Amino acid sequence: MQWGTPSQKDKKVNPVIKKFQYGNDTVTLETGRIARQASGAVLASMGQTSVLVAVTGSKEAKPGQDFFPLSVHYQEKAYAAGKIPGGFFKREARPSEKETLTSRLIDRPIRPLFPNGFLNEVQVVCTVISAEKDVDPDIVAMIGTSAALAISGIPFNGPIGAARVGYTQESGYLLNPTYSTLKTSELDMVVAGTADAVLMVESEAKELPEDIMLGAVLYAHQEMQAVVQAVAELAKDAAKPVWDWKPEEVNAELKAKVEHGFADSVGVAYRITDKQKRYDRLSELRNQAVAELATEESGVSADEVKGLFAKIEKQIVRSRVVAGEPRIDGRDSKTVRPLHVEVGVLPKVHGSALFTRGETQALVVSTLGSARDAQIIDALEGERKDPFMLHYNFPPYSVGECGRMGATGRREIGHGRLARRGIGAVLPKEEDFPYTMRVVSEITESNGSSSMASVCGASLALMDAGVPLKAPVAGIAMGLVKEDNGFAVLTDILGDEDHLGDMDFKVAGTADGVTALQMDIKIEGITEEIMEIALGQAMDARLHILAEMNRVIASPRKELSENAPQFHTMKIDPDKIRDIIGKGGATIRSITEETGASIDIDDNGTIKIYADDGDGMQAAIARIEEITAEAEIGAVYQGKVVRIVDFGAFVNFLPGKDGLVHISQIAHERVQNVSDYLKEGQDIEVKCMDIDQRGRIKLSIKELLPAPEAETAEAPAGEGEE
């Protein structure tokens, strides 16, 4: 992108610029000109899309800090696309769903690369300041984040690269496809990793086989090496000295005391298969350790004891798994927890399902609405409507805790989007099923992989509502424990296995292929073999879950729920649209108020009618047919006199249509004064006699009246009088 030339007088501005070719795009990384007070700042550009990434770190950790406070904020500025924000205040408000998801996308691959024990606060702010409509800025933001961290001096085991991958059978894999290219792609995958390892995968696909998905991951990792190399070269020229930071030394004496006093008891506790009982016992042991070891005389803090206690937990669980011993809940590495599936569990909703897998449970509800219920998304690339929504809720009671209730959190938004990715490939096309669909997953119990339970529940609830899905979908979460002496891939991981393991690998799909894949890896050295094994085990588990789901409901119900809105579509002449809408929308408003129906009209004359019941639907159809009806010669209509003139009367016989009853067509006898026969507002029956080239309609009352008796009797004699 062409930027302004700095003033020659400003000697302090000495930007360092690195350009490199990335597939078909030229990427520019610039530092030293903007945001110079941040620990590290890079302006990353790809084509005309630019993201300013500023990284700031605290030199000291807060006292008592026991977690790594990393925060990532991705924000899209309206001015980047030449737009002014809507709303009363006309400025950017709370983060959109896209901004939240991209923030998580950036956070996930960089978080494991900070050294263990590093607890200093780090903040990453990515601001989209210039945007092309056809380019997603997320990859640019990830590249910029990698570069900003690399030059910041903050301890970081990077750099990372990032790539988006598309796929078509004709073209194979596509590097960093545009929005328009993705419309025809069977895959949308984002991969991030270092020079040696893949760290993060986020994808949705149209039922692709496992080998294509794995190939896409490997292709992305190979291509992103251009980014890793370029960032490393930028760091050579512009990086600040790395902070002189060292992790706190482990208290060897305290560690030995914790291990000697509690390792055996912790090992026994991890044989308790019931989650709550296990947690209660571990809590007792943890409190006992703190009480015995964190005393004033010892000078040891409770946090130190708890930290070492957690390390013992991790060590015990991991060593058992790698050794092939039974897992925490007694299963082997490939067994899925017991399943229980119900549909139609709520009487008044459109579709519902209760999906239970072990101690993870989701109550999922589907709701159908009209086209106007679709979500309006005001994005940088333009406004669009989304007819499908999947919302995920994770109340604190699902894990037996008290907690904050309120605004939707980042985690809930991320899990909802993952579940949506899993379902998206099997949804019907809008022209085949013109309803707006909303799915809500209420996590009522949680012990691992609630997002994949949401996928299963969403598939069941949509089929229960009668939504014509192409195929049922199921999801499963895989885990990994890797030690020097071996590794184990775990099917259907528990929450503890997710926390204590090295990988969270979630796969959703149908019997024919993968629809979504998400992978987060906490260590380096995940090989192609490990990923292949994980995908294979995931497929076996997915097919097992699908078989259990199919026993309850194998295909969508033939009829929509009686609680769902009725739908009817009809086609009219586009010139008639104004008649249905009426002046200032008065006509269509009256139809909706009288019938209770919701009406959407396309510019091509297609009318979509939604109603809560059949009566409202039929009433709305009848009104529209009346308004759009054309006069037919010879047809008889019930009309109302709207105006009387010297030469006849104008009669309204169809909505918006008036015709003339000429004075000669009012009665068989000669009419001298129209007012003697007709009054304004009078209801009469008329017959359509003719429509001239200008569309004027001639009506008759006389044609519907019986002929006079005298005229009828004298007619034969009168034939020969002349």
From Swiss-Prot:
Keywords, sorted A to Z: Cytoplasm, Magnesium, Metal-binding, Nucleotidyltransferase, RNA-binding, Transferase
Protein function: Involved in mRNA degradation. Catalyzes the phosphorolysis of single-stranded polyribonucleotides processively in the 3'- to 5'-direction.
E.C. code: 2.7.7.8
GO annotation (BP), single: RNA processing
GO cellular component: cytosol
Name of the protein in its database record: Polyribonucleotide nucleotidyltransferase
Lineage: Bacteria, Pseudomonadati, Pseudomonadota, Gammaproteobacteria, Cellvibrionales
The organism of origin for this protein: Saccharophagus degradans (strain 2-40 / ATCC 43961 / DSM 17024)
Alphabetical list of Gene3D superfamilies matching this protein: GHMP Kinase, N-terminal domain, K Homology domain, type 1, Nucleic acid-binding proteins
